Amino acid sequence: MSDKASTPKKSATKDATKPKKVGDEEAKKREVKKNFDSYALYISRVLKSVFPDIGITLPSISVMDSFVRDIFERIAMDASSLTRNYQKSTLTTKEIETATKLILKGDLNKHAVSEGQSAVKRAQGQPTSGSKSR
């Protein structure tokens, strides 16, 4: 019994003697950054492009980030439900537009739909008519 008590556990000796790689810590940092989704950078960039002289505080960015996430999740959930209800396997711009109409009301809906349509046209390489370039 004294032999077993005096010998260290194999896993403890492997961990202690195992040399650490230089890239291990950097890889962990990159993993953390990958998993953290935030719109804060984009919110501040859009604000600076629209109003160059105005700044925004970190709590305000946090509120805006939460708002954007919430709206995104709502639109995604409604669009997904519409796709399932229509018994389709592909989510199209039609479902996104319909979900947006269900969530946003009034002028906000009109602006969101028109901006979304112009963004889709730009992505497809079609010229957009009547849209403002910022």
Curated annotation (Swiss-Prot):
Gene Ontology terms for molecular function: DNA binding; protein heterodimerization activity; structural constituent of chromatin
Subcellular location: Nucleus; Chromosome
Biased composition, class Polar residues, residue ranges: 1-10, 125-134
Region (Disordered): 1-29, 113-134
Main location: nucleus
Subunit structure: The nucleosome is a histone octamer containing two molecules each of H2A, H2B, H3 and H4 assembled in one H3-H4 heterotetramer and two H2A-H2B heterodimers. The octamer wraps approximately 147 bp of DNA.
Protein name per its UniProtKB record: Histone H2B
Organism expressing this protein natively: Entamoeba invadens
